[in-house]
Amino acid sequence: MKFYNFNKESGKQITKFNSDFIMTRIIQTNKNASIGCIHLGENGLIGFHKAVGPQLLLILNGEGLVSINQEEYYKVQPGDAVFWEKNEWHETKSENGLTAIVIESEELNPSAFMPSKT
């Protein structure tokens, strides 16, 4: 399990085409990717399971906890990205709810675009 940031501070100012915004690149892949939105409600749980392939979880709203061993949990909040390798066991839970985007693909390299979270 690795942690990354995709918050505003890790982005780049874009001014092309008279634009004025900050964009944080997240991932690029040449292989098929599955992208979904997860809505965990109050006391929501994504049960302990093995990642079927590389998986990137992007926290958009709310807070939660992630674990790879069901003993030590790490807090996640908006702007955090969590990466699990294929076959890595993990669990995600939230006391008050969270919304996240999940990206699954055989070809994920989040460190190519996002800084590691320290």
In which residue ranges do the predicted regions lie?
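Short beta-strand His + acidic residue motifs that chelate non-heme Fe in jelly-roll/DSBH
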Residues: 46-48, 66-67, 84, 89-95
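Glycine- and acidic-residue-biased ligand/ion/polar-headgroup-sensing regions
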Residues: 52-64, 69
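Short acidic-glycine-tyrosine-enriched beta hairpin
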Residues: 70-86
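A short, N-terminal "cap"/entry segment at the start of jelly-roll beta-barrel domains
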Residues: 1-33, 116-118
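Ligand-binding loop in jelly-roll beta-barrel domains
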Residues: 86-110
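A cytosolic small-molecule/anion-sensing beta-strand core signal
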Residues: 60-61, 77, 96
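Conserved short histidine dyad/triad with adjacent acidic residue
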Residues: 34-51
